[in-house]
């Protein structure tokens, strides 16, 4: 399959630079996987689409202020984007500079350049950086870091983004991008879902900056997926198996929840799904056999991205590309701060290729 098969025309005006004033009032495009039928509504229509006993699986990662500005001690300006926190002193990061720093290079970070760090090693495209500061890494990031808004949101981050670019149930710091399907859930909607008897479970996948990296090969089978850390604890496994046993659906909130659950299913030795704690490089594209997910809530993704490939593997290639064409025509808002889709599984998708 060619990467260009997943391209579509997107006017710049449809890229959302700010979220809706009210989280749950975004638009919702529903795609019936087996038939391709589309219906238009608002996000709170989920209440009518879910049945008592259905299980929603959320990603409770929390976005860290992962973008740092400063300079090398020798003078050159740098921008640091944390990929992951290694421990209380060290990070793995992307560094943008006129000349890549060498091991031993001292970095002066923050507006007043008061935070000192050392680049200690290079791992491929990533740099290991150690802070020379008594505070834990997370405290330093909270003090001097900027929210790492995606590259297509073409504006500086604002104070409000510290909460807006965060799900209301975020709990475990470590992501450098929000699991954006979850941004549409507010407390009143969560309460209404619970009242209806909708079950909820929480995985953790710390979204890395790799989620925004373009696919740089022509043939998607040649793409090497970036690695991200995921946790699927026993209580999630129990909730999934219980939902399946009673004939209810497992509904992933976002592609990160999909990748967490499907990673746990792939690694399972005997049962449908087993607990999973570790890095995942799962790459889902047409031809993939889904094991756990019955429905998916997700935002609209970039052309030629691994995420539109994941959706195509779930709903079917033709149904997905038609839904995107319709979304553009109907002026839905795209990407992280944009509108959402509710998609049910198409069992024929596994047989469909572009």
From Swiss-Prot:
Pathway: tRNA modification; tRNA-queuosine biosynthesis
A GO molecular-function descriptor: S-adenosylmethionine:tRNA ribosyltransferase-isomerase activity
Protein name: S-adenosylmethionine:tRNA ribosyltransferase-isomerase
Main location: cytoplasm
Gene Ontology CC entries for this record: cytoplasm
Entry-linked InterPro entries: QueA, QueA_dom1, QueA_dom2, QueA_sf
Oligomeric and partner information: Monomer.
NCBIfam families referenced in this protein's UniProt entry, alphabetically: PRK00147.1 (NF001140), queA (TIGR00113)
PANTHER family, A to Z: S-ADENOSYLMETHIONINE:TRNA RIBOSYLTRANSFERASE-ISOMERASE
Similarity comment: Belongs to the QueA family.
Disulfide bonds: none
Organism superkingdom: Bacteria
Entry EC no(s): 2.4.99.17
Keywords associated with the record: Cytoplasm, Queuosine biosynthesis, S-adenosyl-L-methionine, Transferase
Cell division listed as a keyword: no
Functional description taken from the UniProt entry: Transfers and isomerizes the ribose moiety from AdoMet to the 7-aminomethyl group of 7-deazaguanine (preQ1-tRNA) to give epoxyqueuosine (oQ-tRNA).
GO BP term (any one): tRNA wobble guanine modification
Chemical reaction(s) catalysed: 7-aminomethyl-7-carbaguanosine(34) in tRNA + S-adenosyl-L-methionine = epoxyqueuosine(34) in tRNA + adenine + L-methionine + 2 H(+)
Organism the protein comes from: Salmonella schwarzengrund (strain CVM19633)
Location(s), subcellular: Cytoplasm
